[in-house]
Amino acid sequence: TGRTRAHRARHPRGCTAYTSAQLVELEKEFHFNRYLCRRRRVEMANLLNLTERQIKIWFQNRRMKYKKDQKAKGILHSPAGQSPERTPPLGGAAATCLLRPAAAVPAWPTTHPS
């Protein structure tokens, strides 16, 4: 209610204020995986009482912060032939859904019946 019209015009949906517990969980997840598949995003949203959109935007913003920090440290541009640490999966961010060990599913049989 103390917001100005100019602020509301620039931020029509409002700004999300994350709790410290939510931030801890989001940062932990980011440490393991910078890109979330939809399934994991839904799990995180339910776990943290946030929307999928809030999770998605938080990860986008966090990746930009990470990229900026790496650039400031001079780490982002590695010598030719060496890839930077943790690049996004091939085929787009949603192409691969890496499950954490607690959520792992049993592997399918590798042989085909004759």
Swiss-Prot record:
Which stretches are labeled DNA-binding? 11-70
According to the UniProt record, where is the region Disordered?
Answer: 70-93
Q: Which UniProt keywords apply?
A: Developmental protein, DNA-binding, Homeobox, Nucleus, Transcription, Transcription regulation
Source domain of life is Eukaryota
Q: What does the entry list under GO cellular component? A: nucleus
Family matches, as Gene3D superfamilies = Homeodomain-like
User: What processes in GO biological process is this protein linked to?
Assistant: anterior/posterior pattern specification; cartilage development; cell-matrix adhesion; DNA-templated transcription; embryonic skeletal system morphogenesis; glossopharyngeal nerve morphogenesis; Notch signaling pathway; positive regulation of gene expression
Molecular function as annotated in GO: DNA-binding transcription activator activity, RNA polymerase II-specific; RNA polymerase II transcription regulatory region sequence-specific DNA binding; sequence-specific double-stranded DNA binding
Q: What is its main location?
A: nucleus
Q: Which InterPro entries match?
A: HD, HD_metazoa, Homeobox_CS, Homeodomain-like_sf
User: What tissues is it present in?
Assistant: Predominantly spinal cord and kidney.
User: Pfam families, from UniProt?
Assistant: Homeodomain
**Keyword DNA-binding recorded:** yes
PROSITE patterns recorded: HOMEOBOX_1 (PS00027), HOMEOBOX_2 (PS50071)
Functional summary from the UniProt entry? Sequence-specific transcription factor which is part of a developmental regulatory system that provides cells with specific positional identities on the anterior-posterior axis.
Protein's UniProt name: Homeobox protein Hox-D3
**Organism encoding this protein:** Rattus norvegicus
